[in-house]
Amino acid sequence: MNEQIPHDKSLDNSLTLLKEGYLFIKNRTERYNSDLFQARLLGKNFICMTGAEAAKVFYDTDRFQRQNALPKRVQKSLFGVNAIQGMDGSAHIHRKMLFLSLMTPPHQKRLAELMTEEWKAAVTRWEKADEVVLFEEAKEILCRVACYWAGVPLKETEVKERADDFIDMVDAFGAVGPRHWKGRRARPRAEEWIEVMIEDARAGLLKTTSGTALHEMAFHTQEDGSQLDSRMAAIELINVLRPIVAISYFLVFSALALHEHPKYKEWLRSGNSREREMFVQEVRRYYPFGPFLGALVKKDFVWNNCEFKKGTSVLLDLYGTNHDPRLWDHPDEFRPERFAEREENLFDMIPQGGGHAEKGHRCPGEGITIEVMKASLDFLVHQIEYDVPEQSLHYSLARMPSLPESGFVMSGIRRKS
């Protein structure tokens, strides 16, 4: 037992976590006036922590490991079994370089261009519709774009099914019951679909282009010179495609931010890429996306009067850190201007994780997320006019991942002249 830090007295907090969602850690760090506390989750003792200093410690690879940290239920829905998110050391860096090679600025630019093309093509159909649900449209467009960019053949008739499978994997993360099992069923379907392509590419039955995600995953060699087995290559290719489709959550929150804070429409119209970047960053900070991340203590150490024993499970609060008043002035206000003079910090703005993408566990696709969001924001602000009919735009911080209940319905869509 760790006597130096607060202990949550509940026998097990698993159900409470599902009830409180994004606020589970934040509620307790505020209650105990402490950046860390101990609680029982899933029948085990966890240390939960928040803040930039905690993030700095959490991303110290000498102190923490990811191997064996992810519950099987998360591997079997969201990430895939034994994928990059659970690797450490030189093997992790070697695999990470593969992902980073696919997410360079030219790749980011290409994806943003493809998004713009797809958005513009969608308007013709939207103009004839009474209304459209932005989330449904965004996930299919992102799926189409991600597969095309990655070199993954995708028939138009299967776009909806594949997009739904990717989103179901994401939606299963914070769920029990039907939502979780929907994601569990989606994963093997997607893995089998992609594995056939990996095998066909290796057999020369499917032509691939060097530099595309399909080609690079199919022919990647590990540190020992061997190729990934075809199922693992499929899992890692899904770890490229699925997060791109998941940007649809951020795109809906961007539209919600424009609706709830209409003064920024004019601000964006009279601005340029810099204003778009600030707006996008504030959407990523303010609205809920990843709630927390887990790791295991690699070796005994003491931090902040707390003993971290080898093998202890630790959760880092992403949402709470992004809303920490010590790091953010009026954190519960939506204010893109806060990024005008803000210096970059690897540990205070962590919607997709913290630290270095190259050497650590920060999401390698963060640049893609930002560029796709900027291109989509530009489309919403400069390319179309639309109405927002009465609907439930409420989103619950108890639901992980969260999304406005209506998916953001738009009506009367027309091209700007």
From Swiss-Prot:
Coiled coil: none annotated. InterPro entries: Cyt_P450, Cyt_P450_E_grp-I, Cyt_P450_sf, Cytochrome_P450_3A. PANTHER family: CYTOCHROME P450 FAMILY 3, FATTY-ACID PEROXYGENASE. It is an enzyme of class 1 (oxidoreductase). Belongs to the cytochrome P450 family. The keyword Electron transport does not apply. Heme binds at C363. The lineage of its organism: Bacteria, Bacillati, Bacillota, Bacilli, Bacillales. It catalyses: a 1,2-saturated fatty acid + H2O2 = a 2-hydroxy fatty acid + H2O; a 2,3-saturated fatty acid + H2O2 = a 3-hydroxy fatty acid + H2O; tetradecanoate + H2O2 = (3R)-hydroxytetradecanoate + H2O; tetradecanoate + H2O2 = (2R)-hydroxytetradecanoate + H2O. One of its GO terms (molecular function) is iron ion binding. This is Fatty-acid peroxygenase. Keywords: Heme, Iron, Metal-binding, Monooxygenase, Oxidoreductase. Pfam families: p450. Its EC number is 1.11.2.4. Its cofactor is heme. SUPFAM superfamilies: Cytochrome P450 (SSF48264).
